[in-house]
């Protein structure tokens, strides 16, 4: 499958409903994200030790590790691990500027997704979106709000469905297509590009407009 950036969101009528394959991708997103969160958090604990942020909700997620979707989440976590550590400061600074709460998190998440995918969709940007969802859930939990991870999971599935990302993934065979990728230089560059775009778009949209 091609890993490059795809075309931007197509223009469709307001009454067009997602196809069954798109709805399936959105449904599968929840399991993929839970697996991604669990393994990424596990990796951070292994590499950072006591310095890693604690989150029992992430440690006790219900998983099906041998399922295809569970493997997809783990694969994306492995790909995104180095990038998340490299750009941890940028994520934290972004969240400090946005100050997300339970009341505004969905709106912020939606605007970030709109900015990130404005000029097209790629696996790099999808991984960047998952990474931001992970950081968002961790940030809010550290500020005393428990149970928010489940909301972020639902937010992400909804955004994937209604921003044409589900269509893009479905056209490539579903989430299973992500298993074709490994931690190689080309994909790493794509993920870095996605993270950089995320920061640039959000800062421009919220603080310079």
Swiss-Prot record:
Task: Show the ranges annotated as biased composition (Polar residues).
Answer: 18-27
Residues carrying N-acetylalanine: 2
Write out the coiled-coil annotation as residue ranges: none
**Residues passing through the membrane, by range:** 186-203
Question: What are the binding positions for Zn(2+) in this chain?
Answer: 158, 162
Q: Where is this region: Disordered?
A: 1-28
InterPro entries the record matches: Bcl-2-like_sf, Bcl-2_BH1-3, Bcl-2_fam, Bcl2-like, Bcl2_BH1_motif_CS, Bcl2_BH2_motif_CS, Bcl2_BH3_motif_CS
Membrane topology of the entry? Single-pass membrane protein
Q: Where is this motif: BH3?
A: 72-86
- Tissue-specificity statement: Widely expressed.
Query: What is one Gene Ontology biological process annotated in the Swiss-Prot or TrEMBL record?
Result: positive regulation of apoptotic process
According to the record, the signal peptide region is none
UniProt keyword terms in alphabetical order? Acetylation, Apoptosis, Host-virus interaction, Membrane, Metal-binding, Mitochondrion, Mitochondrion outer membrane, Transmembrane, Transmembrane helix, Zinc
Alphabetical GO CC annotations of the entry are: BAK complex; cytosol; endoplasmic reticulum; mitochondrial membrane; mitochondrial outer membrane; mitochondrion; pore complex
Tell me the compartments it is located in.
Mitochondrion outer membrane
Motif span (BH1)?
Answer: 115-134
PROSITE patterns documented for this protein: BCL2_FAMILY, BH1, BH2, BH3
Q: Motif BH2: where?
A: 167-182
Which domain of life does this protein belong to? Eukaryota
Q: Name one Pfam family in it.
A: Bcl-2
Q: What is known of its domains?
A: Intact BH3 motif is required by BIK, BID, BAK, BAD and BAX for their pro-apoptotic activity and for their interaction with anti-apoptotic members of the Bcl-2 family.
How would you summarize the oligomeric state and partners of this protein? Homodimer. Formation of the homodimer is zinc-dependent. Forms heterodimers with BCL2 and BCL2L1 isoform Bcl-X(L). Forms heterooligomers with BAX. Interacts with BCL2A1. Interacts withRTL10/BOP. Interacts with VDAC1. Interacts with GIMAP3/IAN4 and GIMAP5/IAN5. (Microbial infection) Interacts with gamma-herpesvirus 68 protein vBCL2.
PANTHER family in UniProt:
BCL-2 HOMOLOGOUS ANTAGONIST_KILLER (PTHR11256:SF41), BCL-2 RELATED (PTHR11256)
What functional role does this protein have?
In the presence of an appropriate stimulus, accelerates programmed cell death by binding to, and antagonizing the anti-apoptotic action of BCL2.
Q: Which family does it belong to?
A: Belongs to the Bcl-2 family.
**What is the official name of this protein in its record?**
Bcl-2 homologous antagonist/killer
Species: Mus musculus (Mouse)
